[in-house]
Amino acid sequence: MSGDRKRVGFVTGSRADYGIMRNFLKLLDEDGNILLDIITTGALLSEKYGRQVELIYKDGFHVSAEIGLTLDSSSNEKVLFTMSEALGKFAAYFNDNPYDLLLILGDRYEMLSAALAAAMQRIPILHIHGGEATYGNYDEFIRHAITKMSRYHFTSTEVYRERVIQLGENPGNVFNLGALGAENCLQMDEENVTGEVKQLEKDQYFVILFHPETLTGTDVVQQGREILMALENYPDYKLVFIGVNADTDSDLIRGMVSGFVASHKNAVYFENLHTDAYHYLLKHGICLVGNSSSGIIEAPSLGINTVNIGNRQKGRVRGESVMDVGWDAAEIKAAMDRAIKKHGSIGQGNPYFQEDAAKNYYQKTLELLSRVEEDRKEPKEFYDLKVMV
C-alpha cells in the first residue's frame, strides 16, 4: 500500500461489466486517497473475443493483473473447470494483494470464483447489482451467492434492496443507488465513435444481442433458428449483431450468427465494441432484439424499445418499453413490427435510472472506506427479519 491511500480492486471479466463501471471507476481513479487496481480475467483476455482488455488500457486505467483462464463454453462441466481454475488463480492473487475493498459487479461465473477467494482471504467485498432475479440463467443463483459473501451492497432498485435484506444482509450496508448503466448511456461521447458504426444510417437498423439460456432446458440451436427466421423478414433494414458472451453453448450461437451474416448483405457483426460505440448503436437504432440485460436497464434511458426474448431476463423489474415474447419467430416478428411503429414515441421512463448515479456510488464508497477497517473487526452477522410465513 502507498502511504495512507486505500487500496481498492475491481474484478472484470467482460466488456459489459467494465462498460457499466467505467464512469464510476474514473471518479475513484482520480481520487488521490485511493489506489485503484483493475483485475482482468475471462473473455476480456481472450483473442477469440477480440482481447477486449485493450479498451481498458486505452481508457488509461492501471491494470494490475491479467488472470487468464481456459475458456470452454461447450458444456456446464467445462464452465465448472474454468471456475475451478479461476478460484485457484484468484486465491493466489488475493493472498499477495490484501485490498481494503474489492468491487464485484453482478453475476458472472468468474465473479463467483473471485468473490469466494476474496471472502476466504477476509477481503471486504462491495457487491453491485445484487438482489436481482433472472430465472432463465445460472446467473440467478450465482448473484445471490455473491451477495452472501459480500459486506456491502449497491442495488439498482428499491425492490432489489429489499431482496438483499431478505437474504439476511444488514440494512445499514445495503444502498439503492440506481443502475450505473442507466445513466452512463446518456453520457456517451459521440466523438469517440468512428468507422463502420458511425456510418450506419440512423433509425434504419435493428441491434441484435442474444445469449444462451442456461437453466430452462431450451435448445440453444432452436433459439437461434427462431430469431434468425424472424430477422429474415427485414431485408430493407440493417441487422447489427453484437458479440455473444462466454456462457455455456455461446459458441453455437456465435457460429449461427456468423453464418447468417456471411449470407446476408444487410447484416453486420461486431465482436468488440467500446462502450460509447455500443450506446451510440442503441440510441440511433430502431430497437434492441434479444435477451441482454442492457435491453432492460440501458435501452429505456435512450428512448428505444426492447424486444426481450425468452426467460433469460425473467424476474427483472422492467419499464413499458420492454416487450416480452417467447422463442417463436412469429412472436418476435410481431414485436419488431410494433417497435417500428412505436419508434421515437416511448419517452425515457426507466425504473433503474437515478440522477448522478456514478457520483453517488463514489461518495458512498468513500463513506464505506472510512469505516471498513472498523467494520471488518467483527464477523458479518445474519440480519433476521421479524416476519412469520
Tell where the protein language model's regions lie, with residue ranges.
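Conserved nucleotide-sugar phosphate-binding/catalytic loop shared by glycosyltransferases and other
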Residues: 35-79, 89
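Active-site and donor-binding regions of nucleotide-sugar-utilizing enzymes
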Residues: 7, 11-12, 18-31, 69-171
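C-terminal amphipathic helix plus adjacent low-complexity
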Residues: 340-389
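Short acidic-hydrophobic, aromatic-tinged amphipathic segments that line or gate anion-handling sites
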Residues: 67, 155, 175-177, 269-271, ...
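Donor-nucleotide binding loops and adjacent catalytic segments primarily
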Residues: 56, 191-286
